[in-house]
Amino acid sequence: MFIFIFLSLWTLLVMGREEGGVGSEEGVGKQCHPSLPPRCPSRSPSDQPWTHPDQSQLFADLSREELTTVMSFLTQQLGPDLVDAAQARPSDNCVFSVELQLPPKAAALAHLDRGSPPPAREALAIVFFGGQPQPNVTELVVGPLPQPSYMRDVTVERHGGPLPYYRRPVLLREYLDIDQMIFNRELPQAAGVLHHCCSYKQGGQKLLTMNSAPRGVQSGDRSTWFGIYYNITKGGPYLHPVGLELLVDHKALDPADWTVQKVFFQGRYYENLAQLEEQFEAGQVNVVVIPDDGTGGFWSLKSQVPPGPTPPLQFHPQGPRFSVQGNRVASSLWTFSFGLGAFSGPRVFDVRFQGERLAYEISLQEAGAVYGGNTPAAMLTRYMDSGFGMGYFATPLIRGVDCPYLATYMDWHFVVESQTPKTLHDAFCVFEQNKGLPLRRHHSDFLSHYFGGVAQTVLVFRSVSTMLNYDYVWDMVFYPNGAIEVKLHATGYISSAFLFGAARRYGNQVGEHTLGPVHTHSAHYKVDLDVGGLENWVWAEDMAFVPTAIPWSPEHQIQRLQVTRKQLETEEQAAFPLGGASPRYLYLASKQSNKWGHPRGYRIQTVSFAGGPMPQNSPMERAFSWGRYQLAITQRKETEPSSSSVFNQNDPWTPTVDFSDFINNETIAGKDLVAWVTAGFLHIPHAEDIPNTVTVGNGVGFFLRPYNFFDQEPSMDSADSIYFREGQDAGSCEINPLACLPQAATCAPDLPVFSHGGYPEY
């Protein structure tokens, strides 16, 4: 029996450390003082029932050694013209990224389920060929690992043709060159007005640029609005616009040919900065002076009050009840493999409950944000975060804040914009958590007297992506009744805009000169459920009131509630527009039945408050077409691995992947199916979003819940269950495992020293 204990005082733990308890080989501290409790086990008891049934690394992200090998092979194959992406200019050839090439599902299942040889382990590399006569982006598959011998160009196979060079993500080197252009060449042309408004000095460090996207208004453009903000080094600069925005055309391969196409300053547009300065000198510009300590309000995250009593802590009196081996997590109920796509973000594979596979893949695909405003950057911004990299911009998890202090933390290795692998420490965490709520319970006071119940204890897999200002907390939560919850929480700084004119039509004022612009957050997920096997059917169930004569009084009528059931036959029938009607119960079912003759199924239940979808007459809507649907179910195809693309952000007008193409009215009866789920919320920033948006109320996602999959509620077999009846001694350890706590939980947790994974260098 294992129970979490909440500690609200640190005294016991501090005493234990100060007295210098020594850990034994089993992780249990020896008492150096008779009044001090022993240390709790730091490892799982050896007799726990879980195992890692498959040690295959099919879904494991590439190791540092594999990444190094692939980069060496690519350097050898692509020749001496290859430049380190960290230093590459637009006219250079460079390897942008290397990550795992996921294996075909059929080959993976043949290995996992039937013992066939594992499919070749391969890497996917994205290469920028800026030095070729026709600059382009190429995707290369390299394998087999660990000793690659081939490199296969899959660009045409995957995308139907070459990838235009202007679709490539912006490298850090390109951003630095743009900054150099702005600060060394452009801003000095308006030194007078900028000194007046914003304490500008040439060569100073008080200002910085903020990026926006997309980059233009039509395919082929590479023109970005950059906002100028105060450089608040001890807090977020995101809240401190000075009212200057520059439209920079950086499509040319030579940075010397980049130009500023338009200037916006505090409510008016100018052809260039020289024109702005000329009109300022002529007294034709009404300048709002912005204090050089920011635009007012509270912006620092440093608390102004001293630390208080230590918050509650959860720990494992008898050691963790799960284990992590490589990328595989196992507990007594659940097993799954985890990973992180460099661009698409967190994902899990081969998810099994009590040994039976429920899902082949559950993965984040895209996160989008659509903004409004009356400044050019705000009104144009439509972010697709895979275009920046939700894995690439993952951040170290902070022990005790991002995850429980005693969670298990894992690193991630990657190659993005570098010739050598980098390591993100503490990129993932896994922990078991008592949610302080019963999973189920009943206290019987009638006819017979008893109590039965079980605590809601869950297994959580988590990562966090910081997309410049916003932080997204990504959770996959595994429940003891076979349910899975997939959830997104948003926090961090809002993206702000300069306040002028009719700004309040587009949000709320959150600072003296700062608008919090209205925007939407949406996340799109791929859910490859395999309910009782690969052949699944889609059922929609709901309710209806049906007028019925009362059998014993036929002259009277009642509105009788009954269940409506419909099998959905095609992809069109199973595509539910965002904001439209959808069945309250929708589930994927197997051809197998449970004990009661119902098809074994898993229900998809969304928890979402998404804003309206982008209008389909928008020229860039097709890049966001996944956002049309709250839920869509399609046949699974190897040719439809993802609902979005790293290349969609910089060319949304001709998207590399248009999710709406996946829905082409094919049959979904008895097929291997994928559910595509959208979850999101509308955010109208307000005063309480300063300095940071909080996670409370800003969490959305979906549940995967068993629906007649079992013959009864599966947690009835839980070793955590509690039951006692009248006449029994509920305080007896033999009757009630909770009564064992005074003996079982007299240890103090062996807390690791606090450490921080550092600040990634991009």
From Swiss-Prot:
Family matches, as PROSITE patterns: COPPER_AMINE_OXID_1, COPPER_AMINE_OXID_2
Recorded GO CC terms: early endosome; endoplasmic reticulum; extracellular region; Golgi apparatus; plasma membrane
Binding sites annotated in the UniProt record for Ca(2+) 1: D528, L529, D530, D672, L673
Cofactor: Cu cation; Ca(2+); L-topaquinone
Record GO terms (molecular function): copper ion binding; primary methylamine oxidase activity; quinone binding
UniProt EC number: 1.4.3.21
Sequence segments annotated as region (Disordered): 23-54
Main location: secreted
Binding site for Ca(2+) 2: E571, F662, N664, E666
Disulfide bonds: C197-C198, C403-C429, C733-C740
Cofactor binding remark: Binds 1 copper ion per subunit.
Record protein name field: Primary amine oxidase, liver isozyme
Organism listed in the record: Bos taurus
